[in-house]
């Protein structure tokens, strides 16, 4: 079998969500909701898999105009960001790409063929994901909905 270079073109359906760990949820909600004007998800808009965490105040969800979800995860024990902008990337958690549930096994096989180390699949209430690093060390998630 020929070695592939990664996940096949067209397999990724788009960015599913962006997750950020935040130290001050109130300040972050003000920034993303008021300053940037993103729509805060409330009530039935909150993904069913996150309702409990939202109710507990541990997660707040916003939606960008193109439909991408921004998840803010409250992590009050985070150390302050480095004042040097070139060193402050550690507060971003991961970038998640959505795939169809029937493509998870293929994505895993392609990562193995490309010799890309990964963790998973990990099943959570929000779905199933595999995690690996990009060349700069950012965590990338390829995920599908809970039925995968």
Model-derived regions: residue spans:
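Conserved beta-strand in the GNAT
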Residues: 70-73, 141
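Vicinal oxygen chelate
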Residues: 1-11, 15-23, 58-65, 82-148
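A short, acidic/glycine-rich surface segment
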Residues: 2-5, 45-50, 77-83, 118
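Short consensus segments that form the blades of beta-propeller domains
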Residues: 9, 51-52, 86
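Acetyl-CoA-dependent GNAT
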Residues: 74-79, 145
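Core segments of cupin and vicinal oxygen chelate
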Residues: 21-69
């Amino acid at each position: 079998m020929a070695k592939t270079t990664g996940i096949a073109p067209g397999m990724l359906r788009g960015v599913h969500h962006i997750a950020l760990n935040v130290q001050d949820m109130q300040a972050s909600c003000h920034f993303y909701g008021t300053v940037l004007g993103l729509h805060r998800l409330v009530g039935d808009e909150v993904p069913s898999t996150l309702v409990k965490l939202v109710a507990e105040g541990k997660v707040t969800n916003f939606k960008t105009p193109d439909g991408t979800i921004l998840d803010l995860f409250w992590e009050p024990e985070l150390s302050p960001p480095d004042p040097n902008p070139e060193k402050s990337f550690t507060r971003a958690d991961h970038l998640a790409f959505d795939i169809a549930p029937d493509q998870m096994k293929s994505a895993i096989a392609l990562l193995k063929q490309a010799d890309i180390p990964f963790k998973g699949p990990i099943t959570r209430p929000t779905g199933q994901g595999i995690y690996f690093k990009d060349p700069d060390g950012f965590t990338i998630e390829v995920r599908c909905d809970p039925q995968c």
